């Protein structure tokens, strides 16, 4: 081996060592940032913008679900009030809507402080990254052949196109899309090469990464960008930063994202369904056993069956309640279509609308009208029933006094008075309400003082004697007057309607 050959081999080794040192070591002032590092930063930034848009999309969907379920509940509440015969069906559908609404609130509740703050932190980090990259991208010569850049080709520092909007996402976040990647993976993959951030090749012209100690007379400490993701030595430019494996849990702009991102991904998932609000949607829900199965839990809640009382065939029960015929037409849906009301609009004006035309605000206004109407009817019917019962009690007490024979026997009763001028011997002894009141005897007490109840009084009467207002002949027997019974039934209907409003 000649001396010249040995010298040549030594020179090659020194050149190789110099190349390796240039490739693997930082330490050249003005060296540009690697294109791959800038691209990795941008991939995270774009995903963060998409994550924010996904949050907006998710919350909008949850809001729409809550509104639709609320509308469905109001629709069926109005049916329960307006059509008492359809009340159970209406309450089942109303309960179904309530269940879906509760699920929607649960979806909303997933966005607790950790989740929402993580999205906020991701957007903040995106802004920091965008600002840093945008400044570097702007620091380049307009003559690409000069290879004067702050973002350059990794291997040789030459000019390489950098499409900021395509890589980092548009400046207007809303236009970035809404299918975020995994930010937990992005912070590992996007920042993987940040530690060795400087491009090699000797095209060192980025004034941002200049010898700061010389440029500013005195700069004794390194400068951190992005809370330490990028580190610039005070004299030798871009230098090695702490590895992302450590920074992801310590770097202030990343650590909360890495820790909480799994919670965010879970919060993106929604479970709530939407209750029907249109005629066709109700028909679709009731059309077959598979779809009607969704109503079984609501039917159980409304009826509160004990295990022994639960219908053997739940679908048969539902078909009966919703009055579904052989052609899968539901009389309940038909009843909904037939409901129309004068809905308050503004300044004392009203507008007639059908149920399926009503908005949520219309339904609320219609229910307010019904509540006032029911309250008025309830008060009126309660008064009428009390008065009817009082009148019947007086009549029964009058009959009790009429049956008393002789002045002494009559006057001895604390609620009777003998009238000697009465020509009818059967009516000389009469009920005296004033005497009864002074004696502390109520009509009810007087009525039980030897007379029959209204029911007993009618029960034994012959057909010719069975007359209103107290009695009515039905079939072969004399029964209580249907008038008061009808009033009592009407009162029970109103009470049931009120109960439906509270369900």
Curated annotation (Swiss-Prot):
The lineage of its organism: Eukaryota, Discoba, Euglenozoa, Kinetoplastea, Metakinetoplastina. This is Variant surface glycoprotein ILTAT 1.3. The keyword Hydrolase does not apply. Keywords: Cell membrane, Disulfide bond, Glycoprotein, GPI-anchor, Lipoprotein, Membrane, Signal, Trypanosomiasis. It comes from the Eukaryota. Glycans are attached at residues 419, 432. One of its GO terms (cellular component) is side of membrane. It is found in: Cell membrane. It comes from Trypanosoma brucei brucei. It holds the Pfam family Trypan_glycop_C. Residues 1-29 form the signal peptide. GO terms for biological process: symbiont-mediated evasion of host immune response. Residues 481-503 form a propeptide. VSG forms a coat on the surface of the parasite. The trypanosome evades the immune response of the host by expressing a series of antigenically distinct VSGs from an estimated 1000 VSG genes. It is a lipid-anchor; GPI-anchor. A lipid is attached at residue 480 (GPI-anchor amidated aspartate). Disulfide bonds join 42-168, 150-206. The keyword Lipoprotein applies.
